[in-house]
Amino acid sequence: MDDDQQFCLRWNNHQSTLISVFDTLLENETLVDCTLAAEGKFLKAHKVVLSACSPYFATLLQEQYDKHPIFILKDVKYQELRAMMDYMYRGEVNISQDQLAALLKAAESLQIKGLSDNRTGGGVAPKPESSGHHRGGKLSGAYTLEQTKRARLATGGAMDTSGDVSGSREGSSSPSRRRRKVRRRSMENDAHDNSNSSVLQAAASNQSILQQTGAGLAVSALVTTQLSSGPAAGTSSQASSTQQQQPLTSTNVTKKTESAKLTSSTAAPASGASASAAVQQAHLHQQQAQTTSDAINTENVQAQSQGGAQGVQGDDEDIDEGSAVGGPNSATGPNPASASASAVHAGVVVKQLASVVDKSSSNHKHKIKDNSVSSVGSEMVIEPKAEYDDDAHDENVEDLTLDEEDMTMEELDQTAGTSQGGEGSSQTYATWQHDRSQDELGLMAQDAQQRDPQDGYWTILETVPYSIASAAPNQTLTTATTLSNGGSSLLTGATVVVELPPDDLGNPVGNIQYTIPALTKNATTNTNTTSLLHKPQATTIQIVKQQHQQQHQQQHQHPQQQHQPQQQQHRQHLTIQQSQTHARQEYIKIDTSRLEDKMLLRDVMQYGATSIAMAPQSATTTVVSTHPVESGLLLADADEAERELELEAMKVDQHDEEHLLDDEGYVIEKIHGDGETVNQPQEKLYINGMSNIIHTATTMTLQPDDCKYACNVCGKTYKIKGSLKRHKNYECGVEPNLKCPHCPHKCKCVLAQVVNFVRHGPKNQLLCQCGRYYNTLSRLMLHQREECQDFKRFQCDFCLKWFKRRSHLNRHKKLHDAELFLEPLSKQKPKTTSGQNLSHDANTDDEVATTNPAATEDESNYPFTSEIKIENEFDEFI
């Protein structure tokens, strides 16, 4: 008996393990036996998976006898094919909303299970199977487009008897276990709202909502009764009911794709035999009743979420009420015209109800948080079919939208997105543009905040000079036109104003100003450095120019200047300050990305003269206006401005005024030929960036020179164009970044670094015998040849005496001509006798030098010892 006992071994996670193995095999491309091609790209797959997920591939692979066939998909994109492969192997795929329609179309053509209607019943739709074990919250279908908020779960009891009309999603997987707590909380709130209908009725604040909701429910129930009242009608009644169903399904809030497809699929065989038509008609009425009940459920949910439904407890009560209302009409038979009109009227009621719900959403925030049903046009997501009882009851659907469970209607309207827009959002945008155009001070702060913080502590602006066409209040800024006409009104220079941010305590620190020297000699106005009155929140740099005016200016601009057209793309800010001298200050902000302009402020702080002026405690009257700049009146490019300045500099005018700023920080003012200056000398306090020496600016006279090439960045002038190019390449805007390892000195070019390195190089390389050091070899040789008395490298072979120059040695050798038979002293043996005098000792005078005292020392102290030996051997050979 023991041998007959059998044990049952069950693999609990057999299905999930088997599915995960296919995914691993696909990633490793192991045991793949077919290839799918789309748009020139290939994807390998398994025949078993394709056959199981698509009847089309199953039929196609049965007809192919190749071991590794290749299928080329013509009208399918590679991205869609990749998404379908992920869906078949993993059971889920993430895709954007704009690609959803194309993916569903491609899946429909390939008959992918779970994404298409791949029935195998020919042209006749099979009878839908009942699925009592499914919960009402998970409505079946090939794919269900449903509201983001699962408000339909409140009427789950009424949908227990609804049939499963899909019958084709055997391979679709259940959703994952996520956001269970959020869904349970929403279900509890929904159940509480359904049980307390009297509280919802008392909370209704708008009587029109109740009337429209009741009318919508009555008409929808009437349409349901009319659609289900003629089961024994003929083919004509079936066609009329089909016509009634089409406008009704278009007005449903929850769009049932499967029901729409069944309606369209049953329209064709409706003209067949009477026997088959009767069977199809029974199926049709059952499906229509289910679709209509779905629409009524959605309307009930919307009405309950807004507190406007009276006596609505479920779908059964709604259907009974609809039957009672539509009783007289059902007795007389279905009328196609009246049914169609009722369907259209039901759609209108649904739309009106949705609009009223949107308008009254602010009065029911606490209920919208529970149900969170917005309107007909809210976001739609894909919900897969529920296959298991536990998953359908406990789990929520993973949607592709943001979690808006705890957001109110006003917060949803403010949320960015395409589905949240509309007339209200466009009106808000127009109002924002109108307010923004009139708030110039706020605009300046916004521009400063939106500036890229990676540009550093400073933000350099364009320094190309501009000109003023006229002195009228409605003036515009231009450059090219004035330069072409002679540049009579070109301003002399600009002032770069750096506004420092406030300290930690909020106290103003001040600003740094720098007056750019004049670029041309055709200027007619004076440039002074002033302090800004308005301090934005962020650190900014502006170009400030002050024009002296002989005539009186108005203190305020015309109010029409504040309402300029919104379509202008370029905008500049003009701040006008009235003073005793009637001077006008112009603050122009021009962003640029030129390297020269970005290096300008740093060069000013390091090498140029700057003035520091604290922000005033009490600001005077400041008028802010906006001047739009047309496309033809924009500032010229830097290179074009440079060429124009070169042409203008050729025309030297002796009666024009010019301001230059020298390297010491003094303001040099050029006066007219008649000796009268345009403005009185004004003392300014400057701080030199290099030495930090405070001195007072003075005025001097400067004669016209021949410097016609001016730098458009720093204002320095040169006579030769090559000098200007050298200045731009190596001096202007170039930071000395080559640091010497021996000293803190920095160089701008490699040549200067080499020269500085030689100064700190090893001293024993260029050391003379006398103990002096030289930087170069040429200077050392010149010293040894002309100056050094200790360096003698020429030696006589007979007397072993040293000479400084070769010519002295040759003249000394001539004295040995009479003693040719004498053996040189270097080859003779040392003699004990002394007193031998040579006949030529008396003739040597100053030519013969004494024996080198350092000859007995180590030869390592003489760097040219080897050279001396080579030259001596060469002389003997000659």
Swiss-Prot record:
Outcome following mutation: residue 107 to V: In ORE120; defective in embryonic axon guidance
Zinc finger (C2H2-type): 709-731, 794-816
UniProt region (Disordered), positions on chain: 115-200, 228-340, 542-583, 826-863
Gene Ontology biological-process annotations: axon guidance; axon midline choice point recognition; axonogenesis; dendrite morphogenesis; gonad development; larval lymph gland hemopoiesis; larval somatic muscle development; nurse cell apoptotic process
Localisation per UniProt entry: Nucleus
Pfam families per UniProt: BTB
Coiled coil stretches, renumbered: none
Domain of life where this protein originates: Eukaryota
GO cellular component: nucleoplasm; nucleus
Record flagged with keyword Transferase: no
Alphabetical keyword list: Coiled coil, Developmental protein, Differentiation, DNA-binding, Metal-binding, Neurogenesis, Nucleus, Repeat, Transcription, Transcription regulation, Zinc, Zinc-finger
MF annotations from Gene Ontology: DNA binding; DNA-binding transcription factor activity; zinc ion binding
Gene3D superfamilies in the cross-refs: Classic Zinc Finger, Potassium Channel Kv1.1, Chain A
PANTHER family registered for this protein in UniProt: BTB DOMAIN TRANSCRIPTION FACTOR (PTHR23110), LONGITUDINALS LACKING PROTEIN, ISOFORMS F_I_K_T (PTHR23110:SF111)
Protein name: Longitudinals lacking protein, isoforms N/O/W/X/Y
Species name: Drosophila melanogaster
Gene from which this protein is expressed: lola
